[in-house]
Amino acid sequence: MTQTVLRIDSSLSGDASRSRVATAQITQNQQPERVIHRDLATDPLPFIDADWAAARLVPEADRTEAQKDALALSDTLISEMRDADTLVIALPVHNFGMPASLKAWVDLIARPGVTFRYTENGPIGLFEGKKAIIVYASGGTPLGASYDYASGHLRQVLNFVGIKDVQIVDTKEQAVAA
């Protein structure tokens, strides 16, 4: 049994979404004590900007109030990840890649010194010991096709921040028992 699941939906199709139905079922199958649900379609995230990029490089103790404000949402998203044992992430494919709303989430959680750190031997992810289930949904881009730029990208991001246990469920196969 999983204690906490972070469920991330990003499909614009509402209740008709295959990925949304699958993330709900997979989350339920995990029998979590707690679910954190982040719906990027109904509550979209802003894109990172120059203020955010500059603030993330300032040591926490030296940040101004404006810099803290610029990072506040990012801090919240990272806290949601930190609290979760398992991430269940819907990945509806748009034009061969992830939707912009999910890419905004990726950009906001990928923070040096917070979710990963650089070493002389390369980057090290700081979120080890977590599991992720990616729920892949596409009307025309088969999972693993040479032009599937979505699943490999999201898997790489998760690996980069230390989440190595990544399973991909293809909604075309209706295998939602994960």
Placement of each model-derived feature along the sequence:
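Residues at the starts of beta-strands that form the adenosine-phosphate
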Residues: 3-4, 34, 130-132, 164-165
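Short histidine/acidic/glycine/proline-rich micro-motifs that form metal-
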Residues: 12-14, 139-142
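Short, acidic/small-residue loops that bind anionic groups at enzyme active sites
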Residues: 109-125
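Glycine-rich phosphate/pyrophosphate-binding loop and the adjoining helix
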Residues: 143-178
